[in-house]
Design a protein with these regions (language model features):
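N-terminal non-catalytic structural scaffold regions of very large proteins
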Residues: 1-75, 81-85, 100-105, 123-124, ...
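A short, glycine/Asx- and small/polar-enriched loop/turn
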Residues: 70, 108-114
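Short secondary-structure junctions
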Residues: 93-99, 135-139
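Short, low-order "capping/linker" segments at domain edges
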Residues: 114-121, 151-162
């Protein structure tokens, strides 16, 4: 397995979509009714309110020999230039990371934001990808996106129907 947990043998396990934990991240296990154990990063906003509840949270750590690929979200702010998306994609795949999803938002005629979902092996692999992407001349800023406020978004959508 990819996680070492005492007393969790046979428990269904999944990775939280809010914070996308990857090997190397400090993590915590949340025992969720119907979903088994959900692994979050320790700094995830969604875990903050329940982290002190021993009934729901368990101490977990990555198996040192973890294998596989893990999803991570990136936000890249860049200057619009011909071929910049191709350059970005080539740079990322050149680091042996796979792009699952990509979307762009044009801020204005000069700047765009590119949201990416990538597969990486661990934090070291992610750091290598980030370093290479930051070397692209048109790239202004690269950030790993974690802990989108999922609940607030849902509440605002539901509230909009009143």
């Amino acid at each position: 397995g990819s996680i070492e947990i005492r007393g969790s043998e046979g428990m269904v396990m999944s990775y939280a979509k809010c914070c996308h934990p990857i090997p190397g991240d400090p993590i915590v296990g949340h025992i969720s009714t119907g979903r088994g154990m959900v692994i979050h990063t320790e700094d995830c906003n969604n875990i903050a309110e329940i982290i002190d509840d021993p009934e729901k949270c368990v101490s977990v750590r990555w198996d040192p020999d973890v294998k596989g690929e893990f999803s991570v979200e990136l936000r890249v702010e860049l200057e619009n230039q011909r071929g910049i998306i191709a350059t970005l994609a080539t740079t990322i795949t050149g680091c042996e990371a796979n792009i699952e999803r990509i979307s762009t938002v044009e801020r204005d005629a000069r700047f765009s934001i590119v949201n990416l979902s990538l597969n990486v092996r661990n934090r070291v692999h992610l750091a290598r990808v980030l370093k290479k992407v930051r070397l692209i001349r048109s790239v202004l800023k690269v950030t790993r996106v974690k802990s989108r406020k999922v609940r607030k978004t849902i509440k605002s959508i539901l509230g909009a129907n009143d």
